[in-house]
Amino acid sequence: MARRSTPFKISSRMTRPASIACLLILLGNLGVAKPASQVHRRIVQLVAHIQRADYEGDRASLQRLYEDLGAFQQDKRFASRVAYWRGFALWRKALNGFNESAPPKELEEDLELAVTEFEKSSAVDPGFTDAKIAEGSCLSNLIFLSQDNSARVQELVAKAGPLLKQAQAEAPTNPRLYWVLGPTRWYAPADRGGGQLKAIELYRKGLQLADEGQGRSQDPLDPSWGKPELLMNLAWSNLHLATPNLQAAQAYAQSALHLVPYWHYVRDILMPQIRKAMGE
C-alpha cells in the first residue's frame, strides 16, 4: 500500500527562533530572493573595495572584485549598476596597468571586457549616462593601443565619437564627463578644437561642477567619483605643458592627496615627478 507524503510542518515543540531558522533555510532552498536592502548593502561594500583598490593600484584585487560582483549580475534589481561597477573594476585595472607597463594585450582584453559590461549597463538602463562616459574612455584607450591598426582605429573612433556626443547631450553637468573628454582634447590637433590649454579648460570646468555637487546621487551604487581624478589630471597637465607650471602641478597633486591620501599613482609616481622637475 502506497504511503502518503507528509506535508512539511514545524513542530510546535520547537523553539520560536529555531522555527524561524528552519523556515528561512527552507525558503532559501526554494530560491526565494534575499531582501533588496541586504543585497544592496553587500554590493555597496564591494563597490567601496573596488574604488579603494583602484586608488591603491591593486590590480589583482580589482580582478578579484570584478569576479565577486558577478554573483549579483543576474539580480534584475541592480543589474545596471552591477554591470557598471564590474566594468569600472576592469577599466581601472587597465588604467593602473598603463602605469606599470603591463602587456598591451592584457590591457586590451581588460578594456574590451569593460566595454561589454558598460554596454550591458546601458542596455538595462538607457538613461544611465555614466555607463556611456566610462565606455567612451575605454574606447579612447583602445584607440591608443591600436595606433598600428588604422582600420581598428577608424572602427573605434566611429563608435566612441557618437557615444561621447550623446553623453554630452544627456549630462552636460556631469564632472566625470569632463575628466574623460580632457585627454581627447589634449592630444587632438588645434584645428579640431584640441590642445593642451583646451584640455585644462575642460578639467577646470569639471572641477567647478564637482565643487557645486553636480553628478552626485543619494544612492551609493551611483558613481560620485570625479573630483580627485580631475585634480590629478590638472596636476599631470600642468607638469606636461609646453611651458610647465610646476607650482600649479604641485598644488593640484597635493589637493588630490588631501582627498585620497592613499592614492598610489599621485603619491608614488606623479608627486616624485613633479618634485624632480622642481629640482628638489
Task: For every predicted segment, state its role.
Residues 38, 75, 82, 124, ...:
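Short coil/turn linker motifs that delimit alpha-helical repeat modules in TPR/alpha-solenoid proteins
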Residues 217-238, 264-280:
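TPR/TPR-like alpha-solenoid helical repeat scaffolds
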Residues 33-37:
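Boundary at the C-terminal end of the N-terminal hydrophobic targeting segment
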